[in-house]
Amino acid sequence: MSVNSNAYDAGIMGLKGKDFADQFFADENQVVHESDTVVLVLKKSDEINTFIEEILLTDYKKNVNPTVNVEDRAGYWWIKANGKIEVDCDEISELLGRQFNVYDFLVDVSSTIGRAYTLGNKFTITSELMGLDRKLEDYHA
């Protein structure tokens, strides 16, 4: 099993066959546990590769959310983190030297686990209950 708790094959997902079944159906695993984990799966493209390499794995992981874990899954990037993942498409646009907006980004979003929303030119996936855990944001406010 993987050491990183946010790895793709962490925990029970690293088990196979009977070992997986025994762990999956164990009494202690029949209870729903609260989680603040979010997942973002992105289709690989030049723009997304730039975002992963130049923003997410450097400044973002170091200064914003150190729990971010990125795995190369053939044609996709599998990203898992605790709390939230926020993508500022203005930063990507600046890196690319051309316009890149949140709708361009959404074309490459394959799957998510969490609550996803856009606000302005930012895409966010969060574990928070929007409107309950914290006040809803308004782009025009």
Curated annotation (Swiss-Prot):
Pfam hit, one: MmoB_DmpM
Molecular function via GO: monooxygenase activity
Keyword Membrane: no
InterPro entries in UniProt: MethMoxRegMmoB, MOase_MmoB_DmpM, mOase_MmoB_DmpM_sf
Keyword flag Oxidoreductase: yes
Keywords: Monooxygenase, Oxidoreductase
Gene3D superfamilies: Monooxygenase component MmoB/DmpM
Role, per record: The B protein acts as a regulator of electron flow through the soluble mmo complex, switching the enzyme from an oxidase to a hydroxylase in the presence of the substrate.
Quaternary structure annotation from Swiss-Prot or TrEMBL: The soluble methane monooxygenase (sMMO) consists of four components A/MMOH (composed of alpha/MmoX, beta/MmoY and gamma/MmoZ), B/MMOB (MmoB), C/MMOR (MmoC) and D/MMOD (MmoD).
Family the entry assigns: Belongs to the TmoD/XamoD family.
Official protein name in the record: Methane monooxygenase regulatory protein B
Lineage of origin: Bacteria, Pseudomonadati, Pseudomonadota, Gammaproteobacteria, Methylococcales
